[in-house]
Amino acid sequence: MVKSLRFGDLDVPVPGFGAMGISFALGNDLSYEQAEPVLLEALKQGCTFWDTAVSYGPGKNEKLIGEFVKKHNCRDKLFIASKCGVAAFEDGSITNSAEHIQAYIEGTIERLGFTPDLYYIHRMDPNTPLEESIPAMDLLRKQGKTKYIGLSECSAETLRKANSIAKIDAVQAEYSAFETLHETDGLVDTARELDISFIAYAPLGHGWLVENFPYETPDDFAPDDYRRQIPKWQGDNFYANKRIADKFKELARKKNCTLPQIAIAWIAAQGMIAIPGTTKPERLIENFAAREIEIAEEENKEMRKLVDALKPQGDRYSESAMKNIGK
């Protein structure tokens, strides 16, 4: 079983917590009172590696976390990551300019009420050279406005070049038993080679790898649920992918655990920090208990065989969003 993983000079408890869903993307826009129970449960369980971003809201997600930390006086117990790189308060475009980075860290600090531990560039801007954006991120670190810096959904080539300009501490990208693209595009291998922590978002496949999957058709999603725009969740792809998820559930039954637990434990076994999100305290307890699951070598091989055989159908983002990843 994997209960912690190395991040820089720290040992962080795994899995972490992805806060996006409490105010963004899944048809949720929780008030502080609605969000507080799941954050309290995370704190109680010792799930303290949290992930947010300026664009989740925009600004609302950071503000919710900031209010929680202030109310419960728990800054010293949490590792908080946030992200810039999206003009969230302007036109929503991708921008990595030094001016943007400097301006957005100030807003993040104001909303959180403290400096984040880790600050990412959320999406890579092909119009801004790394020679401008990476020194700007490094300057934040030197100024004490963040301790660590990272990139999100970049290419292996970009990660390598960025790390040659200044030490990159983390790369965040989608990774799960349902989505292993980055094993074949070089990103996982490059991160390992350069000793860069890999933070796996969407470790439950954006909702596929859960018990009691609540959707029978693509029309069942809330009107503002972003999955309505993703090919993987629409048309015939929906039904094909649902059958794949059922196969993983059979594996969980053999292990006498839940599907989310074996999915998260498998990611930890790859040496990656998963950041599953939820709005429900009981689901957070379930997810965090994945750290108690022991995956033996033979079980790891069995799951790997299943992962390699059952490839999902459809792109993982809309056509427009696909243009902003892997750059």
Swiss-Prot record:
Region forming the signal peptide: none
Induction context: Expression is induced in response to 2-benzoxasolinone (BOA) exposure. Expression is also induced in response to 6-methoxy-2-benzoxazolinone (MBOA) and 2-aminophenol (2-AP) treatment.
Binding site for NADP(+): 51, 152-153, 202-212, 286-294
Pfam families reported in the protein's UniProt record: Aldo_ket_red
Residue positions of the active site: Y56 (proton donor)
Entry keyword NADP: yes
Null allele phenotype: Shows significantly reduced growth but does not affect tolerance to benzoxazolinone.
Keywords assigned: NADP, Oxidoreductase
GO cellular component, one term: cytoplasm
Enzyme nomenclature, EC number: 1.1.1.-
Gene3D superfamilies in the record: NADP-dependent oxidoreductase domain
UniProt binding sites for substrate: H122
One function term, GO molecular function aspect: aldo-keto reductase (NADPH) activity
Role: Aldo-keto reductase; part of the Fusarium detoxification of benzoxazolinone cluster involved in the degradation of benzoxazolinones produced by the host plant. Maize, wheat, and rye produce the 2 benzoxazinone phytoanticipins 2,4-dihy-droxy-7-methoxy-1,4-benzoxazin-3-one (DIMBOA) and 2,4-dihydroxy-1,4-benzoxazin-3-one (DIBOA) that, due to their inherent instability once released, spontaneously degrade to the more stable corresponding benzoxazolinones, 6-methoxy-2-benzoxazolinone (MBOA) and 2-benzoxazolinone (BOA), respectively.
Family label: Belongs to the aldo/keto reductase family. Aldo/keto reductase 2 subfamily.
Protein name as it appears in the record: Aldo-keto reductase FPSE_08125
Organism phylogeny: Eukaryota, Fungi, Dikarya, Ascomycota, Pezizomycotina
